[in-house]
Amino acid sequence: MNYFKLFNLPQKFELDVNNLTSQYYNLQKKFHPDSYQDKNIYTKKYLEKSMLLNQGYQTLKNMLTRAEHLLFLNNYKVDKKKKIVFNAKFLEMQIELFERLEIHKNKNNKHEINKILLEVSQIEKNYIKKLKNFCNLEKWKIAHSILYKLLFLTKFIKKTKKIQHEIIN
């Protein structure tokens, strides 16, 4: 299923999320079960359409799942469970980040953990720019590789924020 077509939106990485939301609500008005007084009229077909709209909306409103969907539409599957081998430079960065995080977690050093979080957030922003650029250029193989790096960074940021929260509390 092409969610861009479902919402009558251009098939590209950059998306007007307000327009997506507007399209979503307009379509949901037509297909949502609460719109039908007589539940006998509401069919399985409408329920499936409503669920499809929900799934499409959730996919397109998040830039990473939107990129994943774009890649899928261009024959690049993203398997989040698959272990990916990155280039040596990115692998070294991963190891260094985990080591630093572990050291400062054990020391309850919230200042250094904040520094790590800011640093990784900046790296993430740079990769988002790259992803946007390569999607716009339709360089799907490179975009695919960048998306995997972004998935790692997103997970690392989430883990770091959790540790940060634990230290504060």
Curated annotation (Swiss-Prot):
Pfam family, one: HSCB_C
Highest taxon of the lineage: Bacteria
Keywords attached to this entry: Chaperone
Domain J residue range list: 2-73
Protein's GO biological process: [2Fe-2S] cluster assembly; protein complex oligomerization; protein folding
Keyword Methyltransferase: no
GO function terms (MF aspect): ATPase activator activity; protein-folding chaperone binding
Subunit structure: Interacts with HscA and stimulates its ATPase activity. Interacts with IscU.
Function: Co-chaperone involved in the maturation of iron-sulfur cluster-containing proteins. Seems to help targeting proteins to be folded toward HscA.
Family membership: Belongs to the HscB family.
PANTHER family in the cross-refs: IRON-SULFUR CLUSTER CO-CHAPERONE PROTEIN HSCB (PTHR14021:SF15)
Name this protein carries in UniProt: Co-chaperone protein HscB
Organism: Buchnera aphidicola subsp. Baizongia pistaciae (strain Bp)
